[in-house]
Swiss-Prot record:
PROSITE patterns: GLYCOPROTEASE (PS01016). The lineage of its organism: Bacteria, Pseudomonadati, Pseudomonadota, Gammaproteobacteria, Pasteurellales. It catalyses: L-threonylcarbamoyladenylate + adenosine(37) in tRNA = N(6)-L-threonylcarbamoyladenosine(37) in tRNA + AMP + H(+). The gene is tsaD. Its main location: cytoplasm. One of its GO terms (biological process) is tRNA threonylcarbamoyladenosine modification. Belongs to the KAE1 / TsaD family. Its cofactor is Fe(2+). Pfam families: TsaD. This is tRNA N6-adenosine threonylcarbamoyltransferase. It is found in: Cytoplasm. It comes from Mannheimia succiniciproducens (strain KCTC 0769BP / MBEL55E). Substrate binds at L136, V137, S138, G139, G140, D169, G182, N279. One of its GO terms (cellular component) is cytoplasm.
Length: 344
């Protein structure tokens, strides 16, 4: 079985092909970073229009990469949600149309389930076994999920306001960093010194597994404003020190909540996925945590941390093999709780 996967939930156009016997055999990705850079964030209408231009050429490129034709494809998977409604509609329309034209089944995939299962694309030694705790951390989501199998998910905690990735991006903007801000802030934080600034670790002084990062963003804004009053214009070192303090607070907050979830369940495996999972300090912090707990942390390869078609083709393969099908109606779900997914 070979499944073509299409990802268009936000500002990356991803197309990939997953083969039941060979694994991932094609992976094409186009990012819209340059398109949105002047605006300092994703402009939904521009994102949708760019997906229209790029999806078909990427499908052709993926088929060429795998040395296949349309006749070799057994099914199509596409991101059905959550995400930007216009962007989702582009991918779903193309996917449904191709499925009809090629006379193959199609299935709509949950974007965050794609991220959650992205580590399964790794080789057997680096692939987590069920059950595990998953930390899904991106620009739009911060969730702790108890995972007992494919589709067997329990959201144990999530952000009640800003996602961690969103807080990274907004703090980067306050520091005057280039878009995409989260990655720029992480690079700058590596040059910062510990101890000059100390940020709070929100909601760690109370029980529970929910997150809140809006207050941390406000604390960053106040810290930056005070530093400007003291220095006039912020030096690069001051910016780096603030970035380091902010990132440390986020990483330690995430680690504390992960530790609570692991202790509550007794699990020894932790998966970290989503765009922020590429953050070096976060990876190291969670690796240290799992060493202390005598467990293991798993994460996707760097190219599968951000949005991509590979994770969609893989999850689509699992669900199509199970017999799931999406009818011809072109329907997307900008908001889609994971608990609504069918267990397989």
């Amino acid at each position: 079985m070979r499944i073509l996967g299409i990802e268009t939930s936000c500002d990356e156009t991803g197309v990939a092909i997953y083969d039941e016997d060979k694994g991932l055999i094609a992976n094409q990705l186009y990012t819209q970073i340059a398109l949105h850079a002047d605006y300092g964030g994703v402009v939904p209408e521009l994102a949708s229009r760019d997906h229209i231009r790029k999806t078909a050429p990427l499908i052709e490129a993926a088929l060429q990469e795998a040395n296949l034709t349309a006749k070799d494809i057994d099914g199509i998977a596409y991101t059905c949600g959550p995400g930007l409604v216009g962007a989702l509609l582009v991918g779903s329309t193309i996917a449904r149309s191709l499925a009809y034209a090629w006379n193959v089944p199609a299935v709509g995939v949950h974007h965050m389930e794609g991220h959650l299962l992205a580590p399964m694309l790794e080789d057997a030694d680096n692939r987590p076994q069920f059950p595990f705790i998953a930390l899904l951390v991106s620009g739009g989501h911060t969730q702790l999920v108890k995972v007992e199998g494919v589709g067997k998910y329990e959201v144990m905690g999530e952000s009640i306001d800003d996602a961690a990735g969103e807080a990274f991006d907004k703090t980067a903007k306050l520091l005057g960093l280039d878009y995409p801000g989260g990655a720029a802030l992480s690079r700058l934080a590596e040059k910062g010194s510990a101890g000059r600034f100390v940020f709070p670790k929100p909601m760690t002084d109370r029980p529970g597994l929910d997150f809140s990062f809006s207050g941390l963003k406000t604390f960053a804004a106040n810290t930056i404003n005070q530093a400007i009053k003291n220095e006039g214009e912020l030096s690069e070192q001051t910016k780096a020190d603030i970035a380091h303090a902010f990132q440390t607070a986020v990483v330690e907050t995430l680690a504390i909540k992960c530790k609570r979830a692991l202790k509550e369940t007794g699990y020894k495996r932790l998966v970290i996925a989503g765009g922020v999972s590429a953050n070096k300090q976060l990876r190291q912090g969670l690796a240290n945590l799992m060493d202390d707990l005598k467990g293991r942390v798993f994460y996707p390869a760097p190219q599968f941390c951000t949005d991509n078609g590979a994770m969609i083709s893989y999850v689509g393969y699992l669900r199509l093999k199970h017999g799931e099908r999406t009818d011809l109606a072109i329907e997307v779900k900008p908001r889609w709780p994971m608990i609504e997914l069918e267990a397989i």
